[in-house]
Structure formats: C-alpha cells, structure tokens
Amino acid sequence: MKKHIFFAVALAGAVCFAAELFNGKNLDGWVSVADHSATGGYLASEPTWAVVDGAIRTTGTPFGYLRTKRSDFANYRLKFEYRWWRGTEKPNSGVFLRLSADTGTFIPRAYENQLERESVCSVFALGGAVLEGVAPRTPYDPADALSGIAAVPRKVSSSEKAMGEWNLFEVEVNGDSVVNRLNGVELNRVKGLKTMKGAIGLQSEGGAIEFRNIVLEELP
C-alpha cells in the first residue's frame, strides 16, 4: 500500500497541510512524459528517471518531465533540494507549476521555475499558459511546443551553490503570484498567473539533476 506522510504546519495563524510528494523509494504517484524524437537525444543505455540513494535522478535525456498524478494543486509552498550530479557546461532543468495534466507534449502548458544555472529562479509561461502583462516572445501555436513562451527573468544575483552541492529551493504559489527563494534568498517575485491549479512537474532538459525532500504545504 502506498503511504504518504502528512503533517500540519502553523503559519501566520493559518494551518497548512503538508505532504511529501516523493517517498524516497520509488516513483509511485508520478507520471513520465518524454520526447523520444531525434531532438530529444534519447539515450537507451540509461533510464531517464530513476531513484538513487533517496533522490529522484534524471539524465536529462530525452527531453520531457515527471509530473504528479494529482493535478489540482492550487495554492501552496513547495520545498525541495536539488543538485547537478553530473557536470555539463550549462546544465538545464526546471520545475513546472500548475501544469495541465492533459498536455501530451514534452513541453507542457505550465509555469516553469527555471533551474538552468545562468537563469535560475526566472519564471516562464509555457504551452499557452498566460502571464498577464508579459508579452510572449512569439504568438502561441499549438503545433509548436516552443511558441508562446513568456518570461520574467531573475533580476538579482544568484544564490546557487557550486556544482554537485545540494540547494534548497522554496516556491510559494498563491493566487496569481509566485515567489522563488533559493538557499534562503528571495530571487524572484512574479504576478499575473492566470492558470489557477494543476500538477507539479520535474523537467528533463539536458541537465543531469537530482531532487530530494520534496514537500508541499497547501495554503488555505
């Protein structure tokens, strides 16, 4: 029987219910979506996603994501640790918020917290998701997964640790806003989210990355 750990967190007079989204043993509760085309760079010799020493590990190929089976997360605080476990010059990944579970493409309709080292904590609207007041780079075309991307870059210096070290990422999603903190430092604050609920996703986008201690506190 699958078990989740639930506990209550008192915060500013409100009680939030928290759950560990990853049990540290297997990928129960998660669904993988991947691009197996040539552009995905699929390496058959290694699994895209695996559990290694209590962490979710991805090789970064093929491109795609691992999402929660639950797809109605609305307002919450999400905390997790991540590290780049195998070095590349510009490792890339991200975490998807309010991801539409009916998206079948390797880039979903969602908001992305960027983890790529040069732009960590930047926020993107993907796959037709809307950030009010932020114009997309190109008009959205459902036939083109890379179209319609809107971005709010991080405007302060990164607080990310060196390659191979664990980082603590905290994101608060509440109403139309998202606030990102990395290792205790607020790096970005964005308003204008129009999608109000969805799944949570971990991205495979070329970077060899690990995630652990993934805890979500739902807000009232």
What role is predicted for each listed range?
Residues 18-220:
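Carbohydrate-interacting regions of secretory-pathway proteins
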Residues 4-13:
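Sec-dependent N-terminal signal peptides
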